[in-house]
Amino acid sequence: MTQFSRRSALLTGLALPGIVEAVCHVGASEDDDAKPKRFEELAGFEAAEVASKYPVAILPLGSLEFHGPHNPLGSDSIIVSGIAERVATRTKGLLMPPITFTQCPAHTAHFAGTVSVRPEVMTMYFADVLRNILRLGFRRVFILNGHDGNIGPGRGAIAEVADETKDAALLFASWWEFLSTETMRSLGMFQQANGGHGHGGPLETSAVAAFRPDLIHLDKAKDLPEPPDLSNGAPYFLQKASAKDWPGYSGYVSEASAEKGRKLVKISEDLIVKLVESWLSHGEAPGSW
């Protein structure tokens, strides 16, 4: 009976009490209970009741985008999916599949490997995804973002869908914004004045390494000098049609490590969980109106 499968037991009519249950648990991980429920793994009969079982749906937004020769194309998706899984576990939310094909800016779109969706298409597509999640009965959806290019289309879609509903709330946050420049400087992990921020830079590379160190190839990239800060601290938005001679990443990437990434991801994760729990408990996010 050691090789007796559940299917064999059922087909031969030998599904005796305890046999099927024991077979079903063969190979199950002890950590299974610590993992969140994933929407795509639900059976069809479960779908109609998910909103009554989970306080929030958690939707990760990633990208497929060139992040330098040393990083995987799915860097944003890898990071945000990893953090979203932990947040879903801790908040008992239902984890939705990540949205990977998203809008990428012009200065990365020309690199091989980047797959970009037009902003207006991204907005319409994302809005439809949100509508369908709400149609399941969820009144709270937390969108965890891993890609700067998603912010504009994301906010547009959220505003559109929120205007259509009477009692739903949609919360949007980007994981790296919980690691401010001031926080990064205080940690002293990276020598850059901006604390390691930047596309494909040491902060982002470290975060990827926290989840998939096997996908990092630091030997393929060289350190790049930090561009001068001409803003004097003023907030602004600059979009270039192309970045001439830019190699598709930034910063002193040799300073990246999985150990640093794990610490940074944990800081971001803890603050995100605090935000979501406060929102679920009080109906408002800190600082919102």
Regions flagged by a language model, labelled:
Residues 4, 10-142, 146-289:
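Extended, histidine- and acidic-residue-enriched regions that form the cofactor-binding/catalytic faces
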